[in-house]
């Protein structure tokens, strides 16, 4: 099989089979899988992702489209730098070596990529364009630097975005994340929050789950900002933001963030307060906050209720109010908010009901809208009416106003690492922050770099950071932070339209290809990469780089590939190839010691539950692997890797070869009858396989093709074979299977005597009239009970059906010589004879 696969891969390469032109009279179709990080090896999870994309690309080509299906490398990032530290080498060497190996692996799988458009994000000829784009953002005040409380990973020595912190730990290192103040570069994605939110409803070809995740991440909240005076210090106030200001008469406390400025200004830091602040500083984001037990510590301060000066509320530092959301302060209404209720119960704070309900709010919060009670001038109003009225009162008193907040924060793009795109800015004592002139781009990374494992190598490089200021020519310092790697992946899809463009994009090429028609990747990128790419596209549109404002018309999120995990008696993880099954138990191949099978989980390096792709290819071939990862489960669902599954796919491919040999030896028989049912099945399969591929039900498409192959095999085993239909059906099945298993189908297609390449052939057409059955079976009932079935010709009239069914022997038995009172017909399904 490997020889056949290598043969066709070479032919495709020689013929430039998948290189497409930007000038074509055909309709365009742009299919793209999320570009990979060059880790060194393609794993089976990648293969599934790329196989899905390849089926779509090849299918759309056969449908007559001009298909762009490119590939490139998201090549900056921490693993390369960590490998450099470990091996005392430059990250570039490790990265380029990995790219070479992975490219070879991708080609060996037969994916139909246009390699002439390959991009590499660590190539200065790529990132010089994003450096220029950053300067344009800076000029428009969409890029800025400020001191910010950041998530610091003490192992990787870098800042992490909130999304990169999982359960308080760094997503890569697993280290407990700390909070630090650092000067950071930000992009003003919040300027686009409203458009990003509103446009979600137009992304109709995106999964609902992703759309919902983006809506929640942007998190629009409409409410009010208003001030509480501090008791005994009325010159000072605490400003709160609330989405439910109508519950103001149920206020039980004021909750503030651990880093709220009022703490430094007015609050004595007791050991209890200091300890609590330290504890809060380890909470890294709202996702972790939601899981954390709600706690607080009293500050000693009270505020005065804005509508009743006799009511004073304690000011409490809480672990669930964040400084970067709203004002960093809220009023707590325990009766009608779950978090506030949890804290009130714990700290013995008052719980006052202000919305009508039968629920006992002392036991559980009532969080729905309703009619206001115990609320002075708001009594009897609905929640919405009360909200409008109380905000009107705030505005009359001059203590508050209507406001809108977003959960979405500006995108922190600074990373204190070497292996990333340098931020093209210079710090001058005399001139301040000075952009690098465009004529000096790209700012490249130095080759002579030392990795001692501590901090950012750019910061302690002896010469790289020392430059003259472009404005005053005095000594200055380069910015030593590099871009977050999501910067590169936020615009790469535009570069594929013409990867040799002298500017960031070739506008004409982008106008032809964009938006991407189908984007394929993991749902884990829903609120980072996909949101950032949408943001970049809007800004690029305003900078006249592209005409679209949304990058991806359709999105498909594939499931993961899973495998069982194994551990030895010392609790060490084992690779699947180190384990052998004997009966119902597992043993180590070499030591023969018992092995414990663990959970079936996502394939990962750490748990060693990986399948070596090279070994699988040598054993089964690329086509069998491709077929298996698409056939055992719907593409959007997780897939469990199984040896029996891939062996079954390998047998199916061998069966195709045997079928070809059997068909090739057939001699035309003019006396053979046409197998109408087989002919109908061929046309039925063409129609429904096309529909299945269009709707990404690839496993069902494969099942239909297997069914057709079984029907052809059954016909071949008859004494008198319908040669014409068998040959036609086999040609069709080879064409239908080509997007899934391209190598063996090209080989068989050629042996069938076809001159045109299969990848370039038209998808087979079906005849609608052939889909009609000559006959159909109806259930025959007497008084609603099934008594018989009968196969009718499609041409049978109602009268004929009634006459035939009444005279059936099994029906006559129950009629007992009586005439039917009525005969009810449900077309093509049931005849019910009423006696």
From Swiss-Prot:
Any one GO molecular-function label of the UniProt entry: aminoacyl-tRNA deacylase activity
GO cellular component: cytoplasm
Pfam families reported in the protein's UniProt record: Anticodon_1, tRNA-synt_1, tRNA-synt_1_2, tRNA-synt_1g
Signal peptide range: none
Alphabetical list of InterPro entries matching this protein: aa-tRNA-synth_I_CS, aa-tRNA-synth_Ia, Leu-tRNA-ligase, Leu_tRNA-synth_edit, M/V/L/I-tRNA-synth_anticd-bd, Methionyl/Leucyl_tRNA_Synth, Rossmann-like_a/b/a_fold, tRNAsynth_Ia_anticodon-bd
Positions of ATP binding: 605
Catalysed transformations (reactions): tRNA(Leu) + L-leucine + ATP = L-leucyl-tRNA(Leu) + AMP + diphosphate
Main location: cytoplasm
Enzyme class per UniProt: ligase
CDD domains cross-referenced by the UniProt entry: Anticodon_Ia_Leu_BEm, LeuRS_core
UniProt keyword annotations, A-Z: Aminoacyl-tRNA synthetase, ATP-binding, Cytoplasm, Ligase, Nucleotide-binding, Protein biosynthesis
UniProt short sequence motif 'KMSKS' region, positions renumbered to this chain: 602-606
Protein localization: Cytoplasm
SUPFAM superfamilies recorded: Anticodon-binding domain of a subclass of class I aminoacyl-tRNA synthetases (SSF47323), Nucleotidylyl transferase (SSF52374), ValRS/IleRS/LeuRS editing domain (SSF50677)
UniProt GO BP: leucyl-tRNA aminoacylation
E.C. number(s) listed in UniProt: 6.1.1.4
Ranges spanned by the short sequence motif 'HIGH' region, renumbered to the chain: 36-46
NCBIfam families: leuS_bact
Similarity section: Belongs to the class-I aminoacyl-tRNA synthetase family.
Protein name, per record: Leucine--tRNA ligase
Species annotation: Rickettsia felis (strain ATCC VR-1525 / URRWXCal2)
